């Protein structure tokens, strides 16, 4: 079945009953320690895929070379494996839609750019970074909406070079039409709308695609049927839907998840909150079972028992069995570490002595109390 056929077959009036096996993906960028949001999205992806006999794909979106951090891709593999969120396809395991790294797919994107340029749906922009900065500052000073002013649209390179603020390394921009569709049916948010976008860059001066082009092309070519992402991407959805329309391929269903927020209701940031780093939970001794349970509760209600009582402790398997998009909380919950500590304590107390000891060894080794493979005398000196 082709990518288009898979997408068309998976579209259904009932989002929780796809006609064909669904395909979902998580697509982190290797820009440092993996964000806890990667695990948050991945577990919802995986739950829906497993419930309906579909596939879960890991794609590495490494087109932002300025922010690329060596070794962070391996951290993605390691932390997702630690949580038990195993993918069916990805750079490390392969699959029918390889390659799964965007930097290895650069030849894939150019034909799509050429098509849009030839059809007049995109154009070259030679504006320098300084000229764009001045433009935005002027718009802000006049309290105007910020966005590209189309100075380059309809001009040849020679015509544009005669004007100030010229760069000989152009980008390619979408030509957003006046009648761009701004509404869609979201699996979580329901009927949703976003502001009109400006003429977004889809190909950078270095030849790398921007997120907006690459994500649409890759999701299409990998036959992704459901795109699960945070609500911060709602404003990008109209331009993505427009690209699907222009490229004449079916669009996937969108599910915009509630954001992970701190006590001040601000989005959790790795710059401000150590708990935004997925590796932090490993370092602090949280059990993966507890973290998955906690993340599920950030966007999904507890289990309601037959007697009406709520049960907040549940396994990933239980979460998968009862998963429905309609039950995802639109607003989300506060990222309360007290709740995680309580859950972690519960799961620790459920461990048998042998399992507890094996999980303690890495921490004891880090403190210099035992070797990486402790001997019986070393263990005998310990008192739990």
Language-model-detected regions and their locations in the chain:
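Short, histidine-centered active-site or binding-site loop motifs used for metal coordination
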Residues: 26-30, 60-62, 217, 221, ...
């Amino acid at each position: 079945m082709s990518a288009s056929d898979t997408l068309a077959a998976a579209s259904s009036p009932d989002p929780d009953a796809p006609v064909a096996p669904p395909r979902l993906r998580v697509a982190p960028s290797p820009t440092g320690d993996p964000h806890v949001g990667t695990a948050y999205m991945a577990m919802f992806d995986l739950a829906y895929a497993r419930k309906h006999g579909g596939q879960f794909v890991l794609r590495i979106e490494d087109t932002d070379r300025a922010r690329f951090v060596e070794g962070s891709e391996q951290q993605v593999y390691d932390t997702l494996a630690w949580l038990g969120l195993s993918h069916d396809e990805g750079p490390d395991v392969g699959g029918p839609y390889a390659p799964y790294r965007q930097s290895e797919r650069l030849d894939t994107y150019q034909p799509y750019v050429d098509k849009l340029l030839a059809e007049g749906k995109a154009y070259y922009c030679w504006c320098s970074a300084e000229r764009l900065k001045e433009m935005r500052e002027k718009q802000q000073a006049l309290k105007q909406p910020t966005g590209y002013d189309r100075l380059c649209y309809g001009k040849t390179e020679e015509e544009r070079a005669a004007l100030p603020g010229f760069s000989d390394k152009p980008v390619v921009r979408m030509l957003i039409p006046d009648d761009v569709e701004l509404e869609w049916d979201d699996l979580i948010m329901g009927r949703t709308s976003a502001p009109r976008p400006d003429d977004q860059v889809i190909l950078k001066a270095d030849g790398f695609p921007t997120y907006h082009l690459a994500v649409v092309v890759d999701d299409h070519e990998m036959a992704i049927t459901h795109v699960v992402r945070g609500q911060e991407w709602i404003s990008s959805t109209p331009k993505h839907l427009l690209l699907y329309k222009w490229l004449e391929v079916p669009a996937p269903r969108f599910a915009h998840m509630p954001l992970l927020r701190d006590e001040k209701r601000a989005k959790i940031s790795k710059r401000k909150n150590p708990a935004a780093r997925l590796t932090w939970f490993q370092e602090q001794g949280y059990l993966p079972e507890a973290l998955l349970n906690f993340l599920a509760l950030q966007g999904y209600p507890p289990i309601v028992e037959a007697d009406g009582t709520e049960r907040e402790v549940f396994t990933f398997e239980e979460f998968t069995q009862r998963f429905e998009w309609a039950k995802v909380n639109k607003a989300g919950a506060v990222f309360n570490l007290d709740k995680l500590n309580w859950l972690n304590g519960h799961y620790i107390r459920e461990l048998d002595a042998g399992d507890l000891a094996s999980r303690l060894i890495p921490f004891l080794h880090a403190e210099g109390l035992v070797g990486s493979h402790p001997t019986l005398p070393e263990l005998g000196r310990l008192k739990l």
